[in-house]
């Protein structure tokens, strides 16, 4: 199964996900969840504004769909500056980055999504820009080539990544602020779902919002996507009002269970339990057993299963926990 085909994929793959931008928080006071990140950023932003400085460079990492782009927009809004957006794969040549940097106004924010995918050539250009606000570029070719320095206005680079471990040390060390986004708690997601329902003009009970939040895998992007599908079900099968029962019916129909697992999650866990007797099983064997790429398992399927205590990574391989066995109503084997 392709990741983009999953209803509970946290990737931005659907046109309606773009519409979520209209309901995203624009200021820190509207930002729900991530209390430690919010309180720290409030202090850092106020301090930078008091000094009249650009905010220090910021690295945001964590699983997809948790609001890295939203936080970048909030930082720019709070600082009262422009936000320029790009992504690592788009910046193929040093000239691409140079063009963006030379068009920045003082204190502007440059947001680079998937910053771990920057090419080494582009990354080299970024180092002096981050550290000294200078751009070193080569003019000409061969023996006639020469290096010139261009002064840049003070700016803030915000890098976002789902794979912080893939960043090179020189790049990672140049970020003065590093923030990790965690999966959201159900009460915070419930607030987000209720807020989105109001923006969409839906009539939704508190327990209906809670039911959607419980199955959203701790991820706001997934919560909003599930809300739209529940809305469709409520409008076609009922009178449009969303209660807990209607939300549960809709999500059951979509094969999203009470833990927020879909077909692929259950397939992975059942493979570990049925084919490998609960594990441990190596990643390559597991990938072959369920017909998925190992990168998909590591980056997409595993993080939430591990965070929720259904799967363990051990030196010998992946293991299903007692909670995973119980989820399927299967008696776990006796421990020796």
From Swiss-Prot:
Give the record's keywords alphabetically: ATP-binding, Cytoplasm, DNA damage, DNA recombination, DNA repair, DNA-binding, Hydrolase, Nucleotide-binding
Q: List GO molecular-function terms, semicolon-separated.
A: ATP binding; ATP hydrolysis activity; four-way junction DNA binding; four-way junction helicase activity
- The EC designation for this entry is 3.6.4.-
Recorded hits in SMART domains, A to Z, give:
AAA
Quick one: which residues bind DNA? 294, 313, 318
One of the protein's GO biological processes: DNA repair
Matching Pfam families: AAA_lid_4, RuvB_C, RuvB_N
Its recorded reaction(s) are:
ATP + H2O = ADP + phosphate + H(+)
Q: Which residues bind ATP?
A: 23-24, 65, 68-70, 131-133, 174, 184, 221
Q: Where is this region: Small ATPAse domain (RuvB-S)?
A: 185-255
Q: Where is this region: Head domain (RuvB-H)?
A: 258-336
The record's GO CC annotations read: cytoplasm; Holliday junction resolvase complex
Enzyme class per UniProt: hydrolase
Residues the record lists as binding Mg(2+): 69
Query: What subcellular compartments does it reside in?
Result: Cytoplasm
Q: Which InterPro entries match?
A: AAA+_ATPase (IPR003593), AAA_lid_4 (IPR041445), DNA_helicase_Holl-junc_RuvB (IPR004605), P-loop_NTPase (IPR027417), RuvB-like_N (IPR008824), RuvB_C (IPR008823), WH-like_DNA-bd_sf (IPR036388), WH_DNA-bd_sf (IPR036390)
Gene3D superfamilies per UniProt? 1.10.8.60, P-loop containing nucleotide triphosphate hydrolases, Winged helix-like DNA-binding domain superfamily/Winged helix DNA-binding domain
Q: Region Large ATPase domain (RuvB-L): start and end of each range?
A: 4-184
Its quaternary organisation is: Homohexamer. Forms an RuvA(8)-RuvB(12)-Holliday junction (HJ) complex. HJ DNA is sandwiched between 2 RuvA tetramers; dsDNA enters through RuvA and exits via RuvB. An RuvB hexamer assembles on each DNA strand where it exits the tetramer. Each RuvB hexamer is contacted by two RuvA subunits (via domain III) on 2 adjacent RuvB subunits; this complex drives branch migration. In the full resolvosome a probable DNA-RuvA(4)-RuvB(12)-RuvC(2) complex forms which resolves the HJ.
Q: What is known of its domains?
A: Has 3 domains, the large (RuvB-L) and small ATPase (RuvB-S) domains and the C-terminal head (RuvB-H) domain. The head domain binds DNA, while the ATPase domains jointly bind ATP, ADP or are empty depending on the state of the subunit in the translocation cycle. During a single DNA translocation step the structure of each domain remains the same, but their relative positions change.
Family (UniProt): Belongs to the RuvB family.
Entries under PANTHER family matching the protein: HOLLIDAY JUNCTION BRANCH MIGRATION COMPLEX SUBUNIT RUVB (PTHR42848:SF1), PTHR42848
Give the protein's function: The RuvA-RuvB-RuvC complex processes Holliday junction (HJ) DNA during genetic recombination and DNA repair, while the RuvA-RuvB complex plays an important role in the rescue of blocked DNA replication forks via replication fork reversal (RFR). RuvA specifically binds to HJ cruciform DNA, conferring on it an open structure. The RuvB hexamer acts as an ATP-dependent pump, pulling dsDNA into and through the RuvAB complex. RuvB forms 2 homohexamers on either side of HJ DNA bound by 1 or 2 RuvA tetramers; 4 subunits per hexamer contact DNA at a time.
What name goes with this protein?
Holliday junction branch migration complex subunit RuvB
